[in-house]
Amino acid sequence: MSKKILILPGDGIGHEIVAEAVKVLEHVNVRHTLNMRLSFDALGGAAYEKYGSPLADETLARAREADAVLLGAVGGPQWDTIDPALRPERGLLKIRAQLGLFANLRPALLYPQLADASTLKPEVVAGLDILIVRELTGGLYFGQPRGSRISKNGEREAFDTLPYCESEIRRILKVGFEMARLRGKKLCSVDKANVLASSQLWRTVAGEMAKDYPDVTLSHMYVDNAAMQLVRYPKQFDVIVTENMFGDILSDQASMLTGSIGMLPSASLDANNKGMYEPCHGSAPDIAGQGVANPLATILSVAMLLRYGMGYIKTADAIEYAVGVVLDSGLRTADIWSEGMTKVGTVAMGDAVVAAL
């Protein structure tokens, strides 16, 4: 029985980087006889232009039917002034929520070949391997009520709400504990329990659940301290689990420890490990169409798709190994280039990975 993969290139550099990831998918599909069927649709600004909505109903239906979704990136300045409900980012938030993709896995892994690309000293980041588990469908980005109004004194005022219920907290913490159990058995739960009621509940639930994972060492850290510690001594972390907004910020920060956000994939999973896979970076409209974007994060997202979504562990390993081979050869896109390396564009980098496979 064939596996169905829905490809959503999105906006900006999305089409360029996804094209290279599709090359890799098609190559391993044939070579390893994986029997995958690929189909394409629009999300974000591209969907707004095509369907009048950042996520069309028919696209959502196709995503539900697919075994996995591969996404490029969404957003662009040309949609900044339209109705907020129709902006590209709302399509991304909606598809995550409608598919129940509550667990976002973002690895921050430093390839040894790129130690010099990090903004931190090589000895600080050498061997870095962190997994950030971010809650994706609750909290501030989805909380109600939200909106804007004119206050009693005539000022413009805007407001958001940060709610979390116990079941939402428990299911993401379970993912964090399970991932820590598979890795270094250390879990750091990041919150703001000294200020936020939602974080106080989060910390309480984490402490209760720790009793079910005696082999995992649980620690707690306030988000402001976690941001500082990620820069000061990032290798103290193994798995970090946190709520939606904190995870959004910390995972982008962690990405730069590796030298470039263009290297980092992500997986967003539901309760049955069905998910959507995408690079951690955005649509980068400033370089769209120039052929210089780094496709490796999207290619590595394909590896995560095969690993978590399809169970093709050896094929996923082969893709990750091929990326290492390409980096060993000295090929670099502009974002990870350094003196003595060979600068290549998006297509050449994708071709090199396929050749290494």
Curated annotation (Swiss-Prot):
Catalysis performed (reactions): (2R,3S)-3-isopropylmalate + NAD(+) = 4-methyl-2-oxopentanoate + CO2 + NADH
A Pfam cross-reference name: Iso_dh
GO biological process: L-leucine biosynthetic process
Residues at which Mg(2+) binds: 224, 248, 252
Entry-linked InterPro entries: IsoCit/isopropylmalate_DH_CS, IsoPropMal-DH-like_dom, Isopropylmalate_DH
Co-factor requirement: Mg(2+); Mn(2+)
EC number: 1.1.1.85
GO function terms (MF aspect): 3-isopropylmalate dehydrogenase activity; magnesium ion binding; NAD binding
Primary location group: cytoplasm
Site description Important for catalysis, residues in chain: 141, 192
Purpose of the protein: Catalyzes the oxidation of 3-carboxy-2-hydroxy-4-methylpentanoate (3-isopropylmalate) to 3-carboxy-4-methyl-2-oxopentanoate. The product decarboxylates to 4-methyl-2 oxopentanoate.
Protein's name in the database: 3-isopropylmalate dehydrogenase
